[in-house]
């Protein structure tokens, strides 16, 4: 029943999103005339080689209108982004509900483990579709935007992806990509599933063994302080794996769509680090351990 109500709400939101996209285009078309007027006024001023009181007054009015138009378009786009975020949240809730229903449905045969190539593609898609944080003028990026860690009292929700420190088969410890199943306030412990085992490998871990992954990409052009900087020590997901390893930032992203370039610690190389490899913002988190000498 919950899945049906989620589906109907998603359909409503998609309709609302479509209307907002149409409004954006209408607003843009409406403001186009004013922008053309600004350009023509500047051309006339250059031709006459002077700024008369008439042109000064006219431009002030045109720019005031342009600013109002831009703010109106911006407000519509923000509403559209909110709709997209709500749709993604509902889709995630639906996925978790379906997963739980599958776990407790004894009448169905067990699902086959996802092929590794499919899993890697899904991880790449998750990184690409991570929303870019777009604040209003003067806003500071929130926790879990880029390199900004979660607040001290933050509790990751079921379905959230995290870096989790677990014991490997050999007894060593490693950081894996995991999905939160639940959190107990009584014990202050998480239950998480190894993402590579699709729920077959479940771990109960204390808070200090969990690092929530970023929920927004940081924009290097507007919020560079929300990114890890060159030579900063991090944990990064090694390409084509589901494990995090220590690495140094080689180059931070320069544009919103760029990845980090990182140097993984690797004793097989003379200087102790691998050649530069690209890792998406989604899969780079702070490393609290000291840097190796």
UniProtKB/Swiss-Prot annotation:
Histone H3K4me3 binding: annotated segments: 264-266
Positions of modified residues (N6-acetyllysine): 288
InterPro entries: SGF29, SGF29_tudor-like_dom, Tudor_SGF29_rpt1, Tudor_SGF29_rpt2
Compartment annotation: Nucleus
UniProt keyword Ligase present: no
GO annotation terms (biological process): negative regulation of transcription by RNA polymerase II; positive regulation of DNA-templated transcription; regulation of cell cycle; regulation of cell division; regulation of DNA repair; regulation of DNA-templated transcription; regulation of embryonic development; regulation of RNA splicing
MF term (GO), any: histone H3K36me3 reader activity
Alphabetized PROSITE patterns for the sequence: SGF29_C
GO CC entries: ATAC complex; mitotic spindle; nucleus; SAGA complex; SAGA-type complex
Annotated stretches, region: Histone H3K4me3 N-terminus binding: 194-196, 240-243
Keywords for this protein: Acetylation, Chromatin regulator, Coiled coil, Nucleus, Transcription, Transcription regulation
Location of the SGF29 C-terminal domain: 152-293
Annotated site (Histone H3K4me3 binding): 238, 245
Function: Chromatin reader component of some histone acetyltransferase (HAT) SAGA-type complexes like the TFTC-HAT, ATAC or STAGA complexes. SGF29 specifically recognizes and binds methylated 'Lys-4' of histone H3 (H3K4me), with a preference for trimethylated form (H3K4me3). In the SAGA-type complexes, SGF29 is required to recruit complexes to H3K4me. Involved in the response to endoplasmic reticulum (ER) stress by recruiting the SAGA complex to H3K4me, thereby promoting histone H3 acetylation and cell survival.
Family membership: Belongs to the SGF29 family.
Record remark: domains: The SGF29 C-terminal (also named tudor-like) domain mediates binding to methylated 'Lys-4' of histone H3 (H3K4me).
Subunit organization: Interacts with dimethylated and trimethylated 'Lys-4' of histone H3 (H3K4me2 and H3K4me3), with a preference for the trimethylated form (H3K4me3). Component of some SAGA-type complexes. Component of the ADA2A-containing complex (ATAC), composed of KAT14, KAT2A, TADA2L, TADA3L, ZZ3, MBIP, WDR5, YEATS2, CCDC101 and DR1. Interacts with (methylated) CGAS. Interacts with TADA3L, GCN5L2, SUPT3H and MYC.
Classification via PANTHER family: SAGA-ASSOCIATED FACTOR 29
Protein name as it appears in the record: SAGA-associated factor 29
Biological source species: Mus musculus
Gene assigned in the entry: Sgf29
